[in-house]
Amino acid sequence: MKKDIHPDYHSITVQLVDGTTYQTRSTYGSAGDTLQLDIDPSVHPAWTGGKSHMLDAGGQVARFNKRFGGLTLGKK
C-alpha cells in the first residue's frame, strides 16, 4: 500500500444549529476544528414536515427571485 496518499483523519467538533456539539473523526479541516452546520435534521424541512423555512445564506434566495421571479411556465 502506498504511503502518504490518504488525507489526514483526525477528531473535530460538529456544532448543530441548536448549539449541540459532538465529537467525530473526519478529514475536514485540521485536528480540533469546529464544523458549524447551517442546517441539520432538527431544522431541515424533509424531517420537520416542511413547515420550516430554509435559511437564506448570503441572499441567494433573494438573488434567485430577482433574476427569475418574472418567469412563467407556459401560463398566461
Swiss-Prot record:
The entry's keywords: Ribonucleoprotein, Ribosomal protein, RNA-binding, rRNA-binding
GO biological process annotation, one example: translation
InterPro entries xrefs: Ribosomal_bL28/bL31-like_sf (IPR034704), Ribosomal_bL31 (IPR002150), Ribosomal_bL31_A (IPR027491), Ribosomal_bL31_sf (IPR042105)
Statement: the UniProt record of this protein carries the keyword RNA-binding: yes
Pfam families: Ribosomal_L31
GO molecular function: rRNA binding; structural constituent of ribosome
GO cellular component, as recorded: ribonucleoprotein complex; ribosome
Domain of life: Bacteria
Physiological role: Binds the 23S rRNA.
PANTHER family: 50S RIBOSOMAL PROTEIN L31, CHLOROPLASTIC, LARGE RIBOSOMAL SUBUNIT PROTEIN BL31A
Subunit organization: Part of the 50S ribosomal subunit.
Similarity field: Belongs to the bacterial ribosomal protein bL31 family. Type A subfamily.
UniProt name for this protein: Large ribosomal subunit protein bL31
Gene: rpmE
